[in-house]
Amino acid sequence: SFPTRRSSDLNKEVEEGFIQFLVPYYTSMNNVESPFEIQKFVREIRSGDYNSFFQRLQSFFADTTYEIIREQELHYENVLFIIFKLVGFYVKVEYHTSRGRIDLVLQTDKFIYIMEFKLNGTAEEALQQINDKHYALPFETDGRRLFKIGVNFSAETRNIEKWIVE
């Protein structure tokens, strides 16, 4: 007979596998600093400190080797999804509404972050899309504070060029 494992043990193994193998693949972060850096992301997200969070992301992406970034917008979306999922936040990518598809929705106990990404566009265009397509509408009756965030990535610098928040 095979030993039985609790679901939480398996989840912990999966999480450790993500940290050990995927995060270093997508970034230059090593195994020692990964948990510490991820804790900083968590604190900033939980406190609604989106500027510190995006500044940390800029530094994070700047330290990522350019060879692994192929399809840039998808790369950034994947990295954000992995980080948010690892730390236990409710996160959805390509969230469908009646008017379109939100690139990323992140929910904490106090905040909802609606993020739209552009590659070689503008953060203003990304935010305008959130407003034009009424992406916040499904969340308006929720009691949590809502942040609409337009983000532009630069293919040249392979990083976040600008973000704006409403």
Mark where each language-model region is.
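Acidic-basic catalytic patches of nuclease active cores, encompassing PD-(D/E)XK
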Residues: S59-K92
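Conserved catalytic cores of phosphodiester-cleaving nucleases, focusing on short active-site segments
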Residues: L80, I102-L119, K133
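Domain-level recognition of nuclease-like catalytic cores that cleave nucleotide substrates
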Residues: P138, D142-E166
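Nucleic acid-processing catalytic cores of prokaryotic defense/repair systems
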Residues: I82, L86-G88, L127, N131, ...
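Short, small-residue-biased leader/transition segments that mark boundaries at the very start
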Residues: S1-S7
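Leucine-rich, amphipathic alpha-helical/linker segments
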Residues: N11-Y66
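Active-site metal-binding core of divalent-cation-utilizing nuclease and nuclease-like domains
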Residues: I83-D109
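Mg2+/Mn2+-dependent nuclease catalytic core
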Residues: L119-A136
